[in-house]
Amino acid sequence: MKLARTVSVAVTGGTGQIAYSFLFALAHGDVFGSDCGIDLRVYDLPGLERVLSGIRMELDDCAYPLLQSLRVTTSLEDAFDGIDAAFLIGAAPRGPGMERSDLLKRNGEIFSLQGSVLNTSAKRDAKIFVVGNPVNTNCWIAMSRAPKLNRRNFHSMLRLDQNRMQAMLAHRAQVPLDEVTNVVIWGNHSAKQVPDFTQSLISGKPAVEVISDRDWLENIMLPSIQNRGSAVIEARGKSSAGSAARALAEAARSIFVPKEGEWFSTGVCSDYNPYGIPEDLIFGFPCRMLPSGDYEIIPGLSWDVFIKNKIQISLDEISQEKANVSLL
């Protein structure tokens, strides 16, 4: 097989459920495309060497043509050395009844360390995708500890929320999923995220025209998406894994193998954004890729009073989380 290029990729939390699903999609070509080789490093904590060796065996047994090299490691320095991309999946998990403040404290040290090692080991233009919750704040911590890396290359995953919203709109309108476009999530990946149905299109028409029941949009769909993660935990006793892995692959593919004009929601550094969100936050915006390979935050979208108020609530939460971790 003739490859266009080979990229070096690190995945943390390699023995966890999300990583287990994601690794096979990555090696198959679902992230970087079918002509891109993968130099893969799978990381997890010391003490998990045996489990890592089992994952290596399975990846080897798949005989993926794109998987040019593979190593498993319990050293962050080894995992991040010279990488082009990192998927920071490993984090202290959220369990039933756990508050976000508990997660902030437990994960602050994890992402501070990972950011510091990225700063000394990764390529200067490496792209970093953070999945572990609270994802916006964890991403901000890692970004803040890696000043040598481009702040624009840090992303917190909102694609799972985008996918959830797309599915709910499609089901309600009784149309195929690909008929629902311009799905926008603002703010934090939390129960205060803002699924902005006023921007979405269904079969090319405004979603609020196709689904005229504003009460359903505001009071059923929106809170259902906001609380979907908790609902999954209550139902299965564990956080979303397969759907999160799928969303991560799609989120990264939108950046590495973009579709012309595609809108996607991602948490990025708020510096110089066109919506007046304070700088030095990781905030969810609708974005699209440019021919240069960089992204832009889609400008010029208007907020009605309902959406504007929801965005302020989400902004307040992100700002408070940042203030809390700054004290740790």
Curated annotation (Swiss-Prot):
Query: Which catalytic reaction applies to this protein?
Result: (S)-malate + NAD(+) = oxaloacetate + NADH + H(+)
Metal-binding among keywords: no
Q: Which GO terms describe its molecular function?
A: L-malate dehydrogenase (NAD+) activity
Residue numbers binding NAD(+): G13, G14, T15, G16, Q17, I18, A19, N107, Q114, V131, G132, N133
The highest taxon in the source lineage is: Bacteria
Q: What's a single GO BP term from this record?
A: malate metabolic process
| EC id | 1.1.1.37
Q: Which InterPro entries match?
A: L-lactate/malate_DH, Lactate/malate_DH_C, Lactate/malate_DH_N, Lactate_DH/Glyco_Ohase_4_C, Malate_DH_type2, NAD(P)-bd_dom_sf
Asked if the keyword Disulfide bond belongs to this entry, the reply reads no
Active site positions, chain numbering:
H189 (proton acceptor)
Q: Which UniProt keywords apply?
A: NAD, Oxidoreductase, Tricarboxylic acid cycle
* Pfam families listed in its UniProt record: Ldh_1_C, Ldh_1_N
- Binding positions for substrate per the UniProt entry: R94, R100, N133, R164
Q: What does this protein do?
A: Catalyzes the reversible oxidation of malate to oxaloacetate.
NCBIfam families per record: MalateDH-SF1, PRK05442.1
> By its UniProt entry, which PANTHER family does this protein fall under?
MALATE DEHYDROGENASE (PTHR23382)
Family recorded in the similarity comment: Belongs to the LDH/MDH superfamily. MDH type 2 family.
Designated name of the protein: Malate dehydrogenase
The gene for this chain is mdh
